[in-house]
Regions:
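S/T-rich, low-complexity, solvent-exposed segments of bacterial secretion/appendage proteins
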Residues: 1-495
Length: 495
């Protein structure tokens, strides 16, 4: 049968275990306002029993582990939805920033300027020889071109801003993955129970930030290490204690940054594989969304040039001259902007046209000869005074169907093409706004759920503290009783 000394060790184990558990409670209370902190729980277990004859005697209590209270599946869901939220936020912010200019319905808007241009031909048709009408028409044509080019440059500026952000975001991703790999090493090599909990919290916070930058998949190994890949699976960012950087290098084609991954000497282009997070949104904006709006402006410019030139042109001796619009790269008036430049291969004999090259808007200009001599504006088909047939025909093009091919979505009038652009812009703005709001609400709900599981509850900690205090007091009282018995034994037999 164990003696009084063994009983003292029983009481001592109780004191030590309650004190260790109280330290955990104190650590929780101290970090109640620490961002990303996960509350910890002291797990106590009975000591291994000893056998004396046929009787088992307990050996007290030990602190078996200190557990961080976390839901790993909830963390993974937060990583996934956070990437979607920041992606939607970035897309909405960018599209909303251009909506006031591109979707302007006032006098400086695309619709008003295109309408004013065709109205200029309508005015000219009422008095074809009127010099003031001709000068006014040229001013409206110039205003329309300037307006289109200004809108196009705005989109170019937005693309350049997105490209600049891509380089910075890639740097942030690499910094975070490097820090996560270092924490993986600390977590995997720590043998003291509970000693890696704070490192896990730091890693969780860093992974939250990483998910805001790029969509990721996270798998935790039995040793506690995170393996992180792009959500597409195309590239590994972190595995064990190693981080693999993304690289952003300028392309020789368009000068924009292209993102790639280099793992074990194998370079993989991941530009199109990154869909979510701030980085995915910036790539999407630069390469797809903003380019789509530019394509609509190009189609509109090509349609105007094609339709107006086909009516305004003059054929003398089999040579076509006197185009109203010209390419700025071919500034001589006899060349102008050839009407064939915009013909879609599938629609060359039909009424639809689309641009064959990007940046059509920036090349569009009024024929320099016409600018120098407004009398070259062709109002009629012949030399008869008052002939207004061509001016009237061009004026009617403004609302005529089948003048602009909208990127495979159908053939529209100029007014329809402008309306489609404004509608598309408005639809995308509202879509991204709705996605942003929905994702913010979802992530907020998930964060609240995480806080309810992993956050520090002061009422709960106060209750635990009182329970442990009573346990400590009871162990101390037990030791005091055993000490008294020991004194009595010594006094009784030590005389």
């Amino acid at each position: 049968m164990p003696g009084l000394n063994a009983s003292l060790y029983l009481g001592l184990s109780g004191l030590q275990a309650q004190q260790a558990a109280l330290n955990v409670v104190g650590h929780n209370i101290a970090n109640v306002n620490t961002p990303g902190y996960t509350r910890q729980r002291a797990d106590l277990s009975a000591g291994q029993s000893q056998v004396e004859g046929q009787i088992y005697f307990g050996t007290g209590v030990t602190l078996s582990s200190v557990q961080g209270i976390r839901d790993r599946f909830l963390d993974l869901q937060i990583y996934r939805e956070t990437a979607k939220q920041t992606g939607a936020d970035e897309r909405y912010a960018a599209v909303n920033a251009i909506s006031s200019s591109l979707g302007d319905t006032g006098s400086t808007g695309i619709a008003a300027q295109v309408q004013a241009f065709f109205q200029g031909f309508q005015d000219l048709s009422t008095n074809p020889e009127n010099a003031a009408f001709r000068t006014s028409l040229l001013g409206k044509a110039q205003a329309m071109i300037t307006g289109l080019q200004t809108k196009y440059r705005l989109l170019d500026d937005q693309r350049a801003n997105a490209d600049q952000s891509i380089g910075a975001l890639v740097g942030e991703v690499n910094t975070l993955t490097g820090q996560i790999a270092q924490l993986n090493q600390r977590i995997a090599t720590e043998v003291t129970p509970g000693a890696n909990n704070d490192a896990r919290d730091q890693r969780k916070t860093l992974t939250d930030k990483l998910a805001g930058l790029v969509g990721i998949n996270v798998v935790e190994s039995p040793k506690g290490e995170y393996q992180i890949t792009l959500d597409s699976g195309n590239a590994v960012l972190v595995t064990g204690t190693s981080a693999f950087d993304l690289t952003a290098k300028r392309s020789g084609n368009d000068g924009y940054l292209q993102v790639s991954s280099n793992m074990a000497g194998t370079v993989v282009d991941v530009n199109s594989a990154i869909k979510e997070g701030a980085l995915g949104a910036k790539l999407d904006l630069r390469d797809n969304i903003l380019v789509g709006f530019q394509a609509q402006l190009d189609q509109l410019a090509a349609g105007v040039a094609k339709a107006v030139n086909s009516v305004h042109q003059t054929v003398v001796g089999g040579l076509t001259t006197n185009y109203f619009f010209q390419s700025s790269t071919e500034a001589n008036g006899s060349n102008g902007l050839p009407v064939s430049i915009t013909a879609s291969p599938a629609l060359q004999s039909g009424p639809g046209w689309s641009t064959l090259f990007k940046g059509m808007v920036n090349l569009l200009s009024v024929n320099s000869d016409i600018l120098a001599n407004p009398s070259l504006i062709t109002a009629g088909t012949g030399l008869a005074v008052g002939d207004n047939t061509k001016a009237l025909a061009i004026a009617q093009l403004g609302s005529a169907a089948g003048t602009v091919e909208m990127g495979g979505t159908g053939i529209a009038s100029f007014t329809g093409a402008v309306a489609a652009l404004v509608t598309d812009l408005g639809t995308q703005t509202q879509t991204y706004k709705a996605q942003s709001t929905a994702q913010q609400n979802l992530v907020s709900a998930l964060q609240s759920q995480r806080d309810s599981i992993s956050g520090v509850n002061l009422d709960e900690e106060a209750s635990n503290m009182m329970t442990l205090q009573r346990g400590y007091q009871a162990s101390a009282r037990f030791i005091s009783v055993i000490n008294q018995l020991t004194d009595q034994l010594v006094n009784q037999f030590g005389k």
